[in-house]
Regions:
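Membrane-embedded beta-strand positions of outer-membrane beta-barrel proteins
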Residues: 62, 153-155, 200
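Extracytoplasmic loops and strand-loop junctions of Gram-negative outer membrane beta-barrel proteins
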Residues: 29-37, 42, 87-91, 113-121, ...
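Conserved small-residue
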Residues: 1-39, 158-160, 165-168
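Outer-membrane beta-barrel pore domains and translocons
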Residues: 54, 65-67, 156-160, 203
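C-terminal beta-signal and terminal closure region of outer-membrane beta-barrel proteins
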Residues: 91-96, 164-204
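Residues that define the transmembrane beta-barrel architecture of outer-membrane proteins
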Residues: 43-47, 126-131, 149, 192-196
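Repeated loop/turn-to-beta-strand initiation elements of outer-membrane beta-barrel proteins
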Residues: 57-61, 143
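Extracytoplasmic gating/loop element in the C-terminal half of outer-membrane beta-barrel translocons
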Residues: 2-9, 13-18, 67-158
């Protein structure tokens, strides 16, 4: 109290390693009145990149895309950071005693206040993905044939690499099951696979 100087514990049952919540409405307790909007699932910028090069029968192409200015709610963490579920290696940075991490809470099956959605779950959703890289060569440059106009061999990689600071499995989470409410919420979908392809273009 600013007038009397009296203090009051707003989380009287909190234990070392618990998540500390902020009393946003200053009523002295943590309740539904302290809930607010955190993060924005909508990118400020969506962009793409396409580069195509050719030289003496060789061709090279790169495509990529990305977003910037959005946040992701890593909600599947609520289901995996419990006593009998699987953990990610991130849990190695949890609080487990004085002087250890103050970023991740302690894991204790009897104290699960970290299960409430908070900014602990909100992360930067910016990313740039190299979606395709292709390298090819047209062997008709080496020999001429009146029957073959193109004999091109190529190799291609899809989903080559993603640049991101997001700690989840894939920052490109999309919309789960077509439901609008899942925009920006990572429900733990398995990320897209990297694919290697080899092919031939033959024209007569």
């Amino acid at each position: 109290d600013p007038e009397t100087g009296a203090t009051q514990k707003i989380m009287p049952d909190a234990q070392p390693g618990d998540v500390i919540f902020k009393d946003l409405n200053n009523n002295g307790v943590i309740d539904d009145g302290d809930k607010t909007f955190i993060g924005d699932p909508h990118p400020d910028v969506t962009y793409g990149l396409s580069i195509t090069l050719g030289y003496k029968g060789f061709d090279f192409a790169v495509t990529g895309y990305g977003v910037a200015g959005n946040q992701i709610a890593k909600s599947y963490r609520n289901n995996t950071n419990t006593t009998f579920d699987n953990y990610t290696t991130e849990i190695l940075g949890r609080w487990h005693g004085e002087g250890t991490s103050n970023r991740l809470p302690a894991i204790d099956g009897s104290a699960i206040n970290y299960g409430y959605v908070s900014d602990l779950y909100i992360e930067d959703g910016d990313y740039f993905r190299i979606s395709n890289v292709t390298l090819g060569y047209d062997f008709t440059r080496l020999f001429k044939s009146k029957y073959i106009s193109q004999l091109r061999l190529y190799a291609s990689v899809q989903n080559l690499f993603t640049f991101t600071n997001y700690s989840g499995m894939d920052p490109e989470i999309g919309y789960g099951g077509g439901d609008d409410w899942t925009s920006g919420i990572d429900l733990g979908y398995y990320p897209g696979a990297r694919t290697y392809m080899f092919g031939v273009n033959l024209k007569f």
